[in-house]
């Protein structure tokens, strides 16, 4: 039994993004897009303090007021859920992830989820859009699997965001 219930209407919530180096360093997507250069400059400054011998260049990912990511990951017990992957497929429907500049990896949260996504055609839609479907396993959230390239900007729908969580070589530009 519970003492009380807190009900939140998620349709009134804005999607958010957490920047390095802590989950609390979060902004609404709208806020991030509007102020990307300034926010990424702040990440670069903090990176210089944490890793003084390294040179990070995230601001180059902002061109003409738009943010260009090198990699996308949908994974883990939060991101790899059926609804998240189904929604990603709906967003990408009849579109492409591009010609090789951007890579998108999708890790369903479990084999039953993966099977259902395949049965209803979601996996096919994602593959046609250019995504790579990976095996279900607990790992992408802590850096096992797709590690970002040096000075690459990786957008991840996962549960973790700590220093060196996704990139293990800060000396080579991985955060």
Can you say where each PLM-predicted feature lies in the sequence?
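Fe-S-dependent hydro-lyases/dehydratases of central metabolism
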Residues: 1-175
């Amino acid at each position: 039994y519970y003492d009380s219930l807190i009900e939140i209407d998620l349709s009134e919530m804005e999607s958010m993004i957490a920047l390095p180096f802590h989950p609390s360093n979060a902004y609404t997507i709208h806020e991030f897009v509007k102020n990307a250069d300034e926010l990424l400059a702040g990440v670069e400054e903090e990176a210089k303090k944490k890793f003084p011998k390294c040179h990070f260049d995230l601001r180059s990912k902002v061109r003409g007021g738009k943010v260009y990511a090198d990699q996308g990951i949908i994974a883990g017990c939060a991101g790899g859920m059926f609804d998240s992957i189904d929604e990603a497929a709906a967003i990408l429907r009849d579109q492409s992830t591009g010609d090789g500049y951007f890579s998108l990896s999708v890790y369903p949260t479990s084999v039953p989820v993966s099977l259902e996504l395949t049965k209803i055609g979601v996996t096919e839609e994602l593959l046609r859009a250019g995504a790579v479907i990976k095996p279900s396993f607990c790992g992408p959230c802590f850096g096992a699997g797709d590690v970002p390239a040096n000075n690459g900007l990786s957008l991840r729908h996962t549960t973790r965001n700590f220093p060196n969580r996704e990139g293990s070589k800060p000396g080579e530009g991985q955060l």
